Amino acid sequence: MLLTLFAFVVALGLLIAVHEWGHYRMAVARGVRVLRFSIGFGKTLVRWKPARQRPGQDTEFVIGAIPFGGYVKMLDERDAPVAEEDRHQAFNTQPLASRALIVAAGPVANLVLAVLLYALVNWIGVQEPRALLSPPVAGSLADKA
């Protein structure tokens, strides 16, 4: 029971991390400043800022106590005022196509993960037990055949 619950939480965490990573990577690729990448909600368990990030990025990475969700917080004028020199990095000032790509990148990342896992399972294969037949019982119809 506990092992099943642990496996569920790990699998869900993987799905959430891949989904949010899709949003994050596309936002960075489109030139949007990502303020926070969070897996989980609630109390912060782990927080770090990598020393090496792309110019203009100062992303804080967080793992929260409740692993049932995540988010990528981007620079956005709807949340707080944005300095004029940073407006080009705000999510809401991006062209519609860029915003659509960023929004779609999460589900696409999950789809790619599903295809890769499906291919991996089929490549490795699934071991099935062999059928073992004992000799027919003496005097049975199968024995007489």
Task: List the model feature ranges, each with a label.
Residues M1-L5, V121-I124:
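C-terminal recognition in membrane/secretory proteostasis and scaffolding
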